[in-house]
């Protein structure tokens, strides 16, 4: 039988955005710790001792590379919020519009590069691996910037902009074409005055498996869909092993990912939050470092004086 908290994660395995925590007020009080520290020297002591580090990343780290977050007052594509388009219902209703939205996102990401935060994580992972220590990255992002930075041990829990899934045969495939199909060339402009292209469904991305030709969809987790149970089990395993957790650029409001770090903290494991602002989970963590991840992470993850040179 799986551990109790993986069962609990499954209960919350539908993707929600902007919802208040389902944890009761009484439980919140029990989980709340003293005000988190911003003492980098103290964090570095924890970092030097850690053998199995888990990094949980969200949209904030990629925003520093110029990737739109689709959150807050400016979080619109044309007149739509991401929550309006990133659903199975929206795709069934208007696959052309949804593919325009994702084509725009693919094109934006293909023109961006990993920032100093991504690179610091990847370099730290490679360096500690040579020392027999582990760094695992669990990301909510679908932009593959961690992968582009060189991160190897990576769990992309919400999928990838650069993978497709056939709605007929179910095959998942990598796809880095630009544009992904000829009909989307020059489409997807985010301006509110732009009219939908109204691309016929037969001209949208199609499956290339022999004898199929089914309509493709982005291989991402949409609002209202379940996360892959196999990935959640991998996440559960890594969180159970970790002795230091970093929460990087995440708002801590999207479930089930918002539960991961507080659960680790409840076991007494040090958790450090790196973000531009505080979040609903900040008070549960031992450390909080405010500012751009590209500034705070390189200092936090730099080689410690106790590390062996390799």
UniProtKB/Swiss-Prot annotation:
GO terms for biological process: peptidyl-lysine demalonylation; peptidyl-lysine desuccinylation; protein demalonylation; protein desuccinylation; regulation of ketone biosynthetic process. Gene3D superfamilies: SIR2/SIRT2 'Small Domain, TPP-binding domain. Keywords: Cytoplasm, Metal-binding, Mitochondrion, NAD, Nucleus, Transferase, Transit peptide, Zinc. The active site is at residue 158. Pfam families: SIR2. One of its GO terms (cellular component) is mitochondrial intermembrane space. NAD(+) binds at residues 58-77, 140-143, 249-251, 275-277, 293. It catalyses: N(6)-malonyl-L-lysyl-[protein] + NAD(+) + H2O = 2''-O-malonyl-ADP-D-ribose + nicotinamide + L-lysyl-[protein]; N(6)-succinyl-L-lysyl-[protein] + NAD(+) + H2O = 2''-O-succinyl-ADP-D-ribose + nicotinamide + L-lysyl-[protein]; N(6)-glutaryl-L-lysyl-[protein] + NAD(+) + H2O = 2''-O-glutaryl-ADP-D-ribose + nicotinamide + L-lysyl-[protein]. Its EC number is 2.3.1.-. Residues 1-36 form a transit peptide. SUPFAM superfamilies: DHS-like NAD/FAD-binding domain. Substrate binds at residues 102, 105. CDD domains: SIRT5_Af1_CobB. InterPro entries: DHS-like_NAD/FAD-binding_dom, NAD-dep_sirtuin_deacylases, Sirtuin, Sirtuin_cat_small_dom_sf, Sirtuin_class_III, Ssirtuin_cat_dom. One of its GO terms (molecular function) is zinc ion binding. It comes from the Eukaryota. It is found in: Mitochondrion; Cytoplasm, Cytosol; Nucleus. Transmembrane segments: none annotated. Binds 1 zinc ion per subunit. Its cofactor is Zn(2+). Residues 37-307 form the Deacetylase sirtuin-type domain. Belongs to the sirtuin family. Class III subfamily. Monomer. Homodimer. Interacts with CPS1. Interacts with PCCA. NAD-dependent lysine demalonylase, desuccinylase and deglutarylase that specifically removes malonyl, succinyl and glutaryl groups on target proteins. Activates CPS1 and contributes to the regulation of blood ammonia levels during prolonged fasting: acts by mediating desuccinylation and deglutarylation of CPS1, thereby increasing CPS1 activity in response to elevated NAD levels during fasting. Activates SOD1 by mediating its desuccinylation, leading to reduced reactive oxygen species. Activates SHMT2 by mediating its desuccinylation. In contrast to class I sirtuins, class III sirtuins have only weak deacetylase activity. Difference in substrate specificity is probably due to a larger hydrophobic pocket with 2 residues (Tyr-102 and Arg-105) that bind to malonylated and succinylated substrates and define the specificity. This is NAD-dependent protein deacylase sirtuin-5, mitochondrial. It comes from Bos taurus. The gene is SIRT5.
């Amino acid at each position: 039988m799986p551990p109790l908290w993986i069962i609990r994660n499954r209960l919350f395995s539908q993707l929600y955005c902007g919802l208040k925590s389902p944890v009761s007020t009484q439980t919140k009080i029990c989980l709340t710790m003293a005000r988190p520290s911003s003492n980098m020297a103290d964090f570095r002591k924890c970092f030097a001792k850690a053998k199995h580090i888990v990094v949980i990343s969200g949209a904030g780290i990629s925003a520093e590379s110029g990737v739109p977050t689709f959150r807050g007052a400016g979080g619109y594509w044309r007149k739509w919020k991401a929550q309006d388009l990133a659903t199975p219902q929206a795709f069934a209703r208007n696959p052309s519009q949804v593919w325009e939205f994702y084509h725009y996102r693919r094109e934006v990401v293909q023109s961006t590069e990993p920032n100093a935060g991504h690179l610091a994580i990847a370099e730290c992972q490679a360096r500690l691996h040579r020392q027999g220590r582990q760094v695992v990255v669990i990301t909510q992002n679908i932009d593959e910037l961690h992968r582009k930075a060189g991160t190897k041990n990576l769990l992309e829990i919400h999928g990838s902009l650069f993978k497709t899934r056939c709605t007929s045969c179910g095959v998942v495939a990598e796809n880095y074409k630009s544009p992904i199909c000829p009909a989307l060339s020059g489409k997807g402009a985010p301006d509110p005055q732009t009219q939908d292209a109204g691309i016929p469904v037969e001209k949208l991305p199609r499956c290339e498996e022999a004898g199929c030709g089914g309509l493709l969809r982005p291989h991402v987790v949409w609002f209202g869909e379940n996360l892959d149970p196999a990935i959640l089990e991998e996440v559960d395993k890594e969180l159970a092993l970790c002795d230091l957790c970093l929460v990087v650029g995440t708002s801590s409001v999207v479930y089930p990912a918002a539960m991961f770090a507080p659960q680790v903290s409840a076991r007494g494991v040090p958790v450090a939050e790196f973000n531009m602002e505080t979040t609903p989970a900040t008070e549960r963590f031992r450390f909080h470092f405010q500012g751009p991840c590209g500034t705070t992470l390189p200092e936090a993850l730099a080689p410690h004086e106790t590390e062996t040179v390799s």
